[in-house]
Amino acid sequence: MSGRRRVVVTGLGLVSPVGSTVAEGWSNLLAGRSGIDLITKFDASGFSCRFAGEVKGFNVEDYMPGKEARHMDTFIHYGMAASIQAVQDAGLPHGDALNEVTAERIGVMVGSGIGGLPLIEQTEDEYKTRGARRISPFFVPASIINMISGHVSIKYGFTGPNLAIVTACTTGLHCIGEAGRMIEYGDVDVMVAGGAESTISPLGLGGFAAARALSTRNDDPKSASRPWDRDRDGFVLGEGAGVLVLEEYEHAKKRGAKIYAELAGFGMGADAFHMTAPNVDGPKRSMLAALRNARINGSEVQYLNAHGTSTPLGDANETNAIKLAYGDHAKRLVVNSTKSMTGHLLGGAGGIESVFTVLATHHQVSPPTINIFNQDPACDLDYCANEARQMKIDVAVKNNFGFGGTNGTLVFRRA
């Protein structure tokens, strides 16, 4: 369909282990500064993994009154903050500046993979020690996943689609991709889209540790997340949120919005293989579907922001999937994992990493993949090891994969 509507990125918001604003996070990322350290949120001494990528220096009252914040789990705080940043960055009209028609053309789709796990743990503890009367009437709306989108919609008066996708570690990316399709198909003109997560809690850490998915490099947390390194031993939990404002191109141009990049393609593909173990076919299908949707050849891509979790199986699997999808061109790609600095934000990963991919395209630079000390011979692509690289990026690709064999890929084009 030659007349399909174009989708562009006009706003960015970020709360992450490397910074609680877009500017701070991007600066630290380019400098190769890790946001991973020993856990301070609770006593993790009894766990095999005692470190994570925690958000630092974040004050929720910069974004909402404390009374409101007390009725939300932390993942909603992060998602709201990133959404507010993105809406402000885009200069979107809201409140009294909207009429009924324009309000209906703006929607919200910010998801989370797990939701309010810390609040669920806390409420369970209070129930056991103090009884049923201590369960807060705000417990359910404070912990369910769609409430980021709900709160953003209420705050700004956006009356278009208001929903949240939940697809494990592909959540944020799927929200962005599906939001873009809503614009492309003419359902809306603007979507606030991304992902958020806050699962650095005893059950969150303990569950992944029990599955032996986490690094146990407790003596050196900052070097623990080492995608594609020979000695990688698991991923590192992270937390935060990343949100994009997506907008129909003519709509953005008409109101004089700045344009960071174009969202040119979105693809998905299932492994249909195993609950948690990776498989090359699903990621390959996802990448090829995104390229088809963007109507570009793989040879036009210069930069790929990978899922790159630092797990022994996952990194090798993604490398092989990239080779299958891109053929000989895979060796010419710059493949980067920002998880080396942020850890893995699970449902928030696609949000913050899409922000980073857009910025890489906008500024024509690849962030480094830090902690590649001895590159795994089985992972033999160019991973932009340890130093940022100025480079031409006309087309960038973003991958995320999740438990259940769910995969997603976005294609961004330079504006």
Predicted ranges, named:
Residues R6-T10, D37, D219-A294, Y303:
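Condensing-enzyme catalytic core mediating Claisen C-C bond formation in acyl metabolism
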Residues T129-S136, G177, R181, Y185, ...:
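Glycine-/small-residue-rich "gating" segment that lines the acyl/pantetheine channel
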Residues M1-V9, D96-A103, A294-E300, K331, ...:
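Flexible, low-complexity linker/loop segments at domain and module junctions
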Residues I135-V140, G160-T167, D229-D233, L333-H344, ...:
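Short pre-catalytic strand/loop immediately N-terminal to key active-site residues, enriched for Gly-Thr
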Residues A86-T102, A252-I259, M287-Y303, A325-H329:
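Phosphate/pyrophosphate-binding loops at sites that engage ATP/ADP/AMP, CoA/4′-phosphopantetheine
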Residues A44-E54, G116-L119, S198-S225, M268-R285, ...:
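Active-site-adjacent elements of ketosynthase-type condensing enzymes
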Residues G79-P93, I145-I148, S153-Y156, P161-E197, ...:
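Active-site-proximal alpha-helical scaffold in enzymes
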